[in-house]
């Protein structure tokens, strides 16, 4: 197992299980255009009454764990966390990066400047000429 500090970077949408996975990181960063969507567990169940009852019991335990985990990570109360997991329409809350930071889910919002972070050149980068070629091909 990795023993050093970890940083999670949300580059798009961290919803559902992705919103849970990033909680394990020591520091969470999100690009300004990223979204964060925590919600209660979802499933499709099939079977007899006993199967459905077992599934419901498992989901209730999972939901209690989600409440505790998000509350612990954010410093919010369990009641506030429950309101985020329910959301305005019963399907969780869709946060912008800034809203997620204000709610304690994200530690830092990365502003988009047109350059890669720290001015580094990404691996597998595409040349400007290649991008222009694709743009011409796609706009014909």
What are these regions (language model features)?
Residues 1-20, 24-140:
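N-terminal organellar transit peptides
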């Amino acid at each position: 197992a990795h023993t050093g500090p970890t940083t999670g970077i949300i580059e798009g949408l961290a919803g559902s299980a992705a919103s849970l996975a990033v909680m394990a990181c020591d520091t969470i960063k999100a690009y300004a255009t990223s979204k964060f969507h925590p919600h209660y567990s979802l499933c499709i169940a099939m079977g007899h009454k006993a199967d459905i009852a077992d599934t419901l019991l498992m989901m209730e335990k999972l939901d209690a764990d989600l409440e505790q985990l998000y509350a612990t990570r954010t410093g919010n109360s369990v009641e506030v966390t429950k309101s985020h997991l329910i959301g305005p329409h019963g399907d969780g809350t869709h946060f912008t990066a800034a809203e997620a930071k204000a709610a304690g889910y994200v530690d830092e919002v990365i502003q988009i400047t047109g350059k890669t972070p720290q001015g580094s050149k990404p691996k597998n980068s595409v040349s400007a000429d290649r991008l222009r070629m694709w743009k011409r091909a796609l706009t014909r």
